[in-house]
Regions:
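Bacterial Sec-dependent N-terminal signal peptides
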Residues: 2-3, 8, 17-46, 53, ...
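Membrane-proximal, proline-rich intrinsically disordered regions
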Residues: 24-73, 99-102, 106, 110, ...
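Amphipathic alpha-helical surface "interface" segments used
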Residues: 72, 194-206, 316-317, 323-330, ...
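C-terminal functional modules
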Residues: 395-514
Length: 514
């Protein structure tokens, strides 16, 4: 597949080559033309690649967010874990930005350019626009102001130093794009990406639900800065129809063989970078589950503990819940003598490289709807029933991810739900905290979406790790840093963004977090 995308990887070289050889002999050109080569990649192939690359960014620096949200830690100071807020972890935050623009942002832009003016491809155009919103939303939520309106225009319009759009403008446009795309999708048009659509295999109805679910997510993101707009978009999303059935979950499927792009990006990165290994003791970077996460699961008698976690006993993985133990993030540089006794992600669930990656779930829809109900924006169901449905869905989805290895007994689910009912007689703040404590566990391992909701709501109420020499004064990051290279290659646009948004600092809040 690499050859198919060479034109888009080296556009300037290709353009220069065309001008150099215009005077060449026709026969020479014919001799040097490979009749079996693909001169222009098919739109379907580019769409598949954009899906793969966009989903892969869930793994890119995902382990850093694991540490930041206190799921995991390491006794070493390594950039793979964000649990200590150290210089090496700070310097790693530009990676998502650097990796996104040459891949999924450029790729989905090429798809849109190819189909937007063809009235027979209205569904392809809508699907591509929805995926573009997904990719950009993940990017802007980490950095704030980013290149958006001029992004990916180097080959087409020779814009090599794109401006940074304000996050407020990006959000306004993304929400409008979702509305327009969802409206445009139609079952009367059969032109889709078919099996090249690795999420829904061309199912128009499911793409529509995905669009409205993203609208629900992004609309709720506005609650701190513009509650009126948040309510308006959330109401539209609910009316349009969001993901409520397991068959509609947005997910990418993977395999255990083939190239790395075919493997679950979260599991693959954790294993490939040696941050977490399934052998208990020979762990190069010293990663384990953090005590905050394991202690919470144990204290709440959460049946997911045995699904997510193992301790290696004499070289054999044990899911015995009584022996699970998290490692403190305060351990400094020296491998603890009892390292092997700390819990780590289970190989057959969390570290399963052929497990699907869930992009939007039934659990997330229900938790967001529960908050909407608390705010008085949705009255068809109670916050309590939506909250409970969210918990059940979050537990049952491990069966979808891992098969029978992830199955949780119905009796244990029922018992947990009964013990953690929403405190409807308490304040809205107390109930909101309950909802987002469940999001912390229920959306795992999507650490970025948990991080987004943590910044917006303040829940779960995590206690920062005041590690010696940390770079944030013992505070949890509020955003990622732009790549240092942007200060050289795109200085004017970078400076404008910093002046508007605030210092390029880990503690500067993005627009919707202010």
């Amino acid at each position: 597949m690499k050859k198919l995308f060479s034109k888009y990887t080296f556009p300037i070289l290709a353009a220069c080559s065309m001008s150099l050889f215009t005077a060449c002999d026709k026969d020479f050109a014919e001799i040097n033309t490979n009749p079996n080569a693909v001169s222009v990649p098919t739109t379907a192939y580019i769409f598949s690649k954009a899906l793969y690359d966009g989903a892969a960014n869930s793994g890119n620096k995902g382990s850093l967010l694991f540490g930041l949200m206190q799921y995991t830690t390491s006794y070493n100071d390594v950039e793979g874990f964000g649990s200590k807020y150290t210089a090496s972890q700070v310097n790693a935050t530009g990676g998502v930005f650097t990796n996104s623009y040459p891949t999924q942002i450029n790729e989905i832009g090429e798809v849109i350019k190819a189909v937007k003016d063809d009235p027979t491809k209205v569904n392809q155009y809508a699907m591509a626009r929805i995926w573009r919103v997904y990719c950009f939303s993940r990017l802007t939520d980490l950095y704030g102001d980013i290149p958006y309106s001029e992004a990916g225009q180097g080959y087409n319009l020779s814009i090599f130093q794109p401006k940074y759009d304000a996050q407020s403008a990006i959000y306004a446009d993304m929400l409008k794009e979702l509305e327009a795309s969802a409206t445009a999708l139609t079952t009367s048009n059969t032109s889709t990406f078919g099996n090249s659509d690795l999420i829904y295999q061309g199912n128009v109805t499911k793409w529509k639900k995905f669009a409205y679910s993203l609208m629900l997510r992004l609309g709720m993101r506005l609650t701190k800065v513009d509650a009126a707009s948040a309510q308006s978009w959330v109401t539209k999303a609910i009316a349009g129809g969001v993901i409520r059935d397991y068959a509609d979950i947005a997910k990418m499927s993977y395999t255990s063989g083939g190239q790395n792009i075919n493997k679950n990006p979260i599991a693959w990165q954790l294993l490939n970078d040696n941050y977490l290994r399934a052998d208990g003791i020979n762990n190069t970077e010293g990663g384990k589950y953090q005590d905050v996460f394991i202690n919470s699961l144990k204290a709440n008698n959460d049946p997911r503990l045995g699904v997510l976690s193992v301790v290696y006993v004499n070289g054999t993985a044990s899911s015995d819940e009584s022996i699970q133990k998290g490692m403190p993030a305060t351990i400094n540089g020296t491998k603890p003598a009892d390292f092997v006794t700390f819990s780590e992600p289970k190989q057959t669930t969390v570290l399963k490289v052929d497990a699907p990656l869930l992009l939007f779930t039934v659990a997330e829809s229900n938790f967001l709807l529960a908050e909407a109900a608390l705010r008085g924006w949705y009255s068809a169901e109670t916050a309590s029933s939506l909250y409970e449905t969210g918990i059940r869905a979050a537990m049952q989805q491990w069966d979808l991810i891992s098969g029978t290895t992830g199955t949780i007994a119905q009796a244990r689910i029922d018992s947990y739900v009964a013990a953690h009912a929403l405190k409807t007689s308490s304040s809205v703040a107390v109930q909101t905290e309950q909802i987002y404590n469940q999001v912390w566990v229920g959306l795992f391992p999507d650490a970025q979406e948990v991080y987004n909701n943590y910044r917006r709501t303040g829940y779960p109420a995590l206690t920062p790790n005041v590690y010696p020499g940390n770079a944030t004064g013992g505070k949890i990051f509020r955003r990622f840093l732009y790549p240092v290279l942007e200060q050289t290659l795109n200085r004017a646009s970078y400076n404008e963004a910093v002046q508007r948004q605030g210092t390029d600092d880990l503690l500067t809040k993005v627009w919707w977090d202010k």
